[in-house]
Amino acid sequence: MRKTPTKKAMKTKTTPYDVAEHLRTPEEMAAYLDAWLEEAPDDAAGIARALGDIARAKGMTQVAKDAGLSRESLYRALSAEGNPSFATVLKVARALGVKLHAEAA
């Protein structure tokens, strides 16, 4: 019995997607945060991570400086385990050049 030759399985190398690499303009950054606020308004940790993504896109060192925080404090506050105070969120938003706004539900 003759065996049919088989092709070796090709392995595809993947890399994790990092949204911060794709946030290039202030408009893209604002739209990204707005999407989080619109789609997951009760997900405080997700919104904090979104702020962290934008901060990484802009440069954590500069954002921390502009927010009056240490770089380490900024990373910690905006990490998945972080729980930033509202004051910190406001400082970071100002440093990022984005505004949080309210509208009637």
Residue ranges and their predicted role:
Residues 32, 74-76, 84:
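Extended, folded domain segments that form the structural surfaces/walls around functional sites
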Residues 85-103:
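DNA major-groove recognition helix of helix-turn-helix/homeodomain DNA-binding modules
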Residues 56-76:
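Short alpha-helical DNA-recognition segment
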Residues 78, 104:
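Short beta->alpha connector loops at strand-helix junctions that form conserved
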Residues 1-49, 53:
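N-terminal flexible/basic segments that precede or flank functional cores
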